[in-house]
């Protein structure tokens, strides 16, 4: 009985789980590129290590090592890979750090000072980044694990007191090695929890697309990591800006990601596009009104000839009034994605009136228009763009079949009007595109779009248009002092 009840609860939870409208998979093919940029950033961060002065005395000898700074990082072996428990794991072994510091020695009244170069050999670093969603649905680095060790220090002293320095080198090098061990992990913890999170803050969560609608890319759950991929599920829903709490139930097919040859894959369900069209419909954007000289002259003449019998019976003050043509969607358009292509179906009303100045409009006809558009998706940079093309068009009257027959001569000119006057306006808006949830400075290249039953996938490679350092410095938090200190378990002596 208990097992049946648990099964029922599991099924109930699954039934109410929100389906993603957008999925992103980062594959292991992207890790080499990420590692190159990440190691460059890591090298710059390790150069910020601050080592306290090392000083002491033995008998009448006093020594002081100060102004220690890291000058360079040499990597012999490094590996970045996915790991289910740690999400992203970086292993660095047999690396070396170049150091530059000031030396001072006092023996009785004899003093020696100057600057010297040293190296930390056998540097090993093992650090893991754990990714999760925060309360706003944004992806974050929630934890950084770190183990670091330096096996030995090399210093080459010279000058008059070289033998004295060599005598104290054991004390000096062991002290500096201990301090260096203690400083590596705090730097990496700060780099992950503060600096990398400032980069992730550039990923859009709820942002405006234009002055009418916005897009919600909230994560629905924590990222899922396997040995070869990092998978993320986003809400992927548009909404009218004037109705921030508006939502559309997602009953579309859940998009699936199965490939792993390219660096990244993005999948969009029919819901993603349906929510966009529903949002524009709710915002009142799916309508167009042409009055007077905005109506093509050929179409104006044809319409007046078609409805001559009705116009001639009107008042002389109305007969020569400007013609008004209003197209308005009667319901939100719907998207259908098949392996053969993507289509959008739309139903609209076409109202033809005479609009005399300062007088009520006179309706000549009201008809129903049904259209089918083909949609071609492309991804440029990190903007998803759509180009629409009118494939099928018909008009009819919902009053009588006889009136529908009378509308046949209007079908060709109205279709031409849509192709010349309406489609360019739609494509101007859709070609602006909507941003994909990627951090600033990272773009898609070499995109391949593939249609499936109910969803579309885009496979692409990644390109760093900006370096991590450039983006992080631009978005660095003003006060990060509290994040410099990692948990006690993060640093290994």
UniProtKB/Swiss-Prot annotation:
Any one of the GO CC terms: high-density lipoprotein particle
Keywords: Disulfide bond, Glycoprotein, Lipid transport, Nucleus, Secreted, Signal, Transport
Keyword Disulfide bond carried by entry: yes
Keyword Signal: yes
Glycosylation site residues: 64, 91, 94, 117, 143, 245, 398
Tissue specificity comment: Highest level expression in the lung, brain and heart with relatively low levels in the liver, skeletal muscle and testis and very low levels found in the spleen and kidney.
Record's catalysed reaction(s): a 1,2-diacyl-sn-glycero-3-phosphocholine(in) = a 1,2-diacyl-sn-glycero-3-phosphocholine(out); a 1,2-diacyl-sn-glycero-3-phosphoethanolamine(in) = a 1,2-diacyl-sn-glycero-3-phosphoethanolamine(out); a 1,2-diacyl-sn-glycerol(in) = a 1,2-diacyl-sn-glycerol(out); a 1,2-diacyl-sn-glycero-3-phosphate(in) = a 1,2-diacyl-sn-glycero-3-phosphate(out)
Function: Mediates the transfer of phospholipids and free cholesterol from triglyceride-rich lipoproteins (low density lipoproteins or LDL and very low density lipoproteins or VLDL) into high-density lipoproteins (HDL) as well as the exchange of phospholipids between triglyceride-rich lipoproteins themselves. Facilitates the transfer of a spectrum of different lipid molecules, including sphingomyelin, phosphatidylcholine, phosphatidylinositol, phosphatidylglycerol, and phosphatidyl ethanolamine. Plays an important role in HDL remodeling which involves modulating the size and composition of HDL.
Family statement drawn from the similarity comment of this UniProt entry: Belongs to the BPI/LBP/Plunc superfamily. BPI/LBP family.
UniProt xrefs under PANTHER family: BACTERICIDAL PERMEABILITY-INCREASING BPI PROTEIN-RELATED, PHOSPHOLIPID TRANSFER PROTEIN
Protein name, entry field: Phospholipid transfer protein
Organism listed in the record: Mus musculus
């Amino acid at each position: 009985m208990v097992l049946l009840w648990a099964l029922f609860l599991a099924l109930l939870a699954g039934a109410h789980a929100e389906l993603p409208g957008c999925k992103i998979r980062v594959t292991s093919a992207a890790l080499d590129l990420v590692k190159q940029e990440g190691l460059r950033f890591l090298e710059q961060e390790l150069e910020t290590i601050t080592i306290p002065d090392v000083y002491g005395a033995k008998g009448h000898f006093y020594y002081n090592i100060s102004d220690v700074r890291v000058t360079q990082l040499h990597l012999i072996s490094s590996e970045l890979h996915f790991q289910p428990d740690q999400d992203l794991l970086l292993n660095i072994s047999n690396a070396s750090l170049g150091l530059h510091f000031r030396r001072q020695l006092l023996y009785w009244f004899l003093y020696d000072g100057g600057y010297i170069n040293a190296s930390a050999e056998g540097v090993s670093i093992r650090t893991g980044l754990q990714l999760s969603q925060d309360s706003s649905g944004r992806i974050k680095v929630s934890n950084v694990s770190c183990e670091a060790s330096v096996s030995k220090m090399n210093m080459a002293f010279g000058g008059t007191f070289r033998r004295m320095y060599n005598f104290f080198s054991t004390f000096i090098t062991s002290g500096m090695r201990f301090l260096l061990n203690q400083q590596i992990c705090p730097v990496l913890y700060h780099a992950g929890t503060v600096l990398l999170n400032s980069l992730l803050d550039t990923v859009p969560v709820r942002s405006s697309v234009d002055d009418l609608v916005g897009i919600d890319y909230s994560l629905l759950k924590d990222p899922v990591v396997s040995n070869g991929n990092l998978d993320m599920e986003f809400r992927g829903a548009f909404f009218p800006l004037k109705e921030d709490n508006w939502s559309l139930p997602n009953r579309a097919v859940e998009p699936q990601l199965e490939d792993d040859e390219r660096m990244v894959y993005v999948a969009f369900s029919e819901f993603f596009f349906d929510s966009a069209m529903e949002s524009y419909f709710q915002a009142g954007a799916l309508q167009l009104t042409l009055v007077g000289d905005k109506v093509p002259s050929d179409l104006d003449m044809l319409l007046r000839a078609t409805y001559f019998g009705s116009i001639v019976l009107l008042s002389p003050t109305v007969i020569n009034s400007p013609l008004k043509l209003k197209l308005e969607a009667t319901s939100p358009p719907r998207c259908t994605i098949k392996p053969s292509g993507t289509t959008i179906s739309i139903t609209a009303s076409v109202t033809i009136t005479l609009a005399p100045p300062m007088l009520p409009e006179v309706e000549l006809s009201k008809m129903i228009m049904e259209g089918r558009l083909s949609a071609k998706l492309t991804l440029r940079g990190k903007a998803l763009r759509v180009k629409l093309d009118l494939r099928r068009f018909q008009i009819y009257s919902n009053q009588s079949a006889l009136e529908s027959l009378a509308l046949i001569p209007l079908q060709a000119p109205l279709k031409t009007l849509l192709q010349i006057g309406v489609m360019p306006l739609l494509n101007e808006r859709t070609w602006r595109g909507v941003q994909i949830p990627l951090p600033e400075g990272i773009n898609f290249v070499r995109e391949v779009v593939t249609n499936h039953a109910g969803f579309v996938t885009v496979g692409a490679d990644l390109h760093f248009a900006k370096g991590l350092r450039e983006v992080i410095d631009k978005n660095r938090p003003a006060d990060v002092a509290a994040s410099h200190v990692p948990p006690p378990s993060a640093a290994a002596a």
